[in-house]
Amino acid sequence: MKRILTGITPSGYPHLGNYIGAIKPSLDLLDGKCESFLFIADLHAVIKVSDPKKLEELSNAIAMAWLASGLDPNKTNFYRQSDVPEITELAWLLSCIAAVSYTHLR
């Protein structure tokens, strides 16, 4: 089974680039033959957005853009990155055993 994994960093309000670069291509790939994981990469945004209320506002705006573009949350795994503690746990474990240069795929 094919899998799709992509996310959008809520470092600003949704724009055409988000739609053309991530939302539309992802929605075009969705069918009953693939498992999809589409997310809001809010952990990636904390270096650019320091105000928690603003980050929540931008995260909600990104979620609304996905949904307004036709995403059916009943047919995909749609989540906020910070809601999955295993992501930060894995990042911490990897940072303990691997240099950053080894974590980049080539």
List where the protein language model places each region.
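N-terminal catalytic cores of NTP/NDP-binding nucleotidyl/phosphoryl-transfer enzymes
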Residues: 1-58, 94
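Short Gly/charged-rich anion-binding patches and loops
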Residues: 24, 61, 89
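Short, internal active-site loops enriched in acidic
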Residues: 43-45, 83-86
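A glycine-rich helix N-cap at a beta->alpha junction
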Residues: 59-76
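Active-site acidic/histidine clusters and adjacent loop/turn architecture
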Residues: 79-80
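Charged, often glycine-rich, active-site loop that binds/positions anionic groups
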Residues: 89-97
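Short loop/turn segments at secondary-structure transitions that flank enzyme active sites
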Residues: 100
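Conserved small/polar residues in nucleotide/adenosyl-binding loops
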Residues: 103-104
